[in-house]
């Protein structure tokens, strides 16, 4: 069966980028997450997951922990400040020790290079739980939410408005991988990285739109989903005051939402700053799917862990 074949290809793998997945593998994970969400599939995975987080986390930490518990496994929280990593032990040494204790590790760190270095030395699955470059688990949840809302991903357009950050990068890659039209509207100086855009265009194979714009209204026109994130990510708090006037025209509000498809949904990876990147009326409005989107982190990560570890 195709599903079983795809699970076999995922077993023991790393997920450092959404582009590490084939289209069939990504679709399989969404299907499995949807089945797990309604209780149709409940694999047991009595393994141990380590969480090595150098950045604050609510949804990612809790959803990974609950997912592992629901699979019958256990979680160890590895705060860098309470391990030898915080005292300067080389990451390569830590990786080679932890892979003898753990069955997988999810890492939230600043640099993608640190994540890659750990994965190079660890023999267990390494999962990107967020870096400054990408946030692949978030995007799996986003795509599941989009598919739930419309019944399909075919022919849909997702419009991301705001900072061309890690979420924008993974949205570009994930949407291109699954054939969803993706538009990103950012101030020119905060556009997504050029190499990510080029990679997304290559993944799309010219079969779906991959567009980077500076005009949020043009980007939002006719879109099936409007998506935003904070204007200053973790580690950029000192820049928030300078960024605010630059990003103000990129706020998702009722006016911008009116330009989208009448059935459009609103997404935000959270935490949200109400009346900054998104107005409270839109965040709490009838087209918002933000809370469903947050819930879906649990289901896609449970599907991912089961596929990598069972």
Curated annotation (Swiss-Prot):
UniProt-listed Pfam families: OTCace (PF00185), OTCace_N (PF02729)
Keyword Cytoplasm belongs to the record: yes
Keywords annotated in UniProt: Amino-acid biosynthesis, Arginine biosynthesis, Cytoplasm, Transferase
Subcellular location: Cytoplasm
Gene Ontology annotations for the cellular component aspect, listed alphabetically: cytoplasm
Positions with a binding annotation for carbamoyl phosphate: 57-60, 84, 108, 135-138, 269-270, 297
Xref: SUPFAM superfamilies: Aspartate/ornithine carbamoyltransferase
E.C. no: 2.1.3.3
Residues binding L-ornithine: 166, 229, 233-234
InterPro entries from the UniProt entry: Asp/Orn_carbamoyltranf_P-bd, Asp/Orn_carbamoylTrfase, Asp/Orn_carbamoylTrfase_sf, Asp_carbamoyltransf_Asp/Orn-bd, Orn/put_carbamltrans, OTCase_ArgI
Major location (coarse): cytoplasm
Pathway this chain belongs to: Amino-acid biosynthesis; L-arginine biosynthesis; L-arginine from L-ornithine and carbamoyl phosphate: step 1/3
Described purpose of this protein according to its UniProt entry: Reversibly catalyzes the transfer of the carbamoyl group from carbamoyl phosphate (CP) to the N(epsilon) atom of ornithine (ORN) to produce L-citrulline.
Official protein name in the record: Ornithine carbamoyltransferase
Native source organism of the sequence: Thermosynechococcus vestitus (strain NIES-2133 / IAM M-273 / BP-1)
């Amino acid at each position: 069966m195709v599903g079983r074949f795809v699970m076999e290809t995922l077993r023991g793998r790393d997920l450092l980028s959404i582009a590490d997945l084939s289209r069939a593998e990504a679709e399989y994970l969404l299907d499995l997450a949807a089945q797990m969400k309604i209780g149709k599939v409940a694999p047991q995975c009595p393994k141990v997951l380590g969480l090595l987080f150098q950045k604050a986390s609510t949804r990612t930490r809790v959803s990974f922990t609950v997912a592992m518990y629901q699979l019958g496994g256990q979680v160890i929280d590895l705060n860098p400040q309470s391990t030898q990593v915080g005292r300067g032990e080389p990451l390569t040494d830590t990786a080679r020790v932890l892979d003898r204790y753990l069955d997988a590790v999810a890492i939230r760190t600043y640099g993608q290079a640190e994540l890659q270095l750990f994965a190079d030395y660890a023999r267990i699955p390494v999962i990107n739980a967020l870096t400054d470059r990408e946030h692949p688990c978030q995007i799996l949840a986003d795509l599941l939410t989009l598919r739930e809302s419309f019944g399909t991903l075919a022919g849909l357009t997702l419009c991301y408005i705001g900072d061309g950050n890690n979420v924008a990068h993974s949205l570009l890659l994930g949407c291109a991988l699954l054939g969803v039209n993706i538009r990103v509207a950012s101030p020119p100086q905060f556009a997504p990285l050029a190499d990510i855009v080029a990679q997304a265009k290559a993944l799309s194979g010219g079969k779906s739109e991959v567009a980077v714009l500076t005009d949020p209204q043009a980007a939002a026109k006719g879109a099936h989903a409007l998506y935003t994130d904070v204007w200053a990510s973790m580690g950029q708090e000192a820049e928030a005051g300078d960024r605010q006037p630059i990003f103000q025209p990129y706020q998702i509000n009722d006016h911008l939402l009116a330009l989208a498809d009448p059935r459009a949904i609103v997404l935000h990876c959270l935490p949200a700053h109400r009346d900054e990147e998104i107005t409270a009326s839109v965040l709490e409005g009838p087209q918002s799917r933000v809370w469903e989107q947050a819930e879906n982190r649990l289901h896609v990560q449970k599907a991912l862990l089961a596929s990598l570890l069972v």
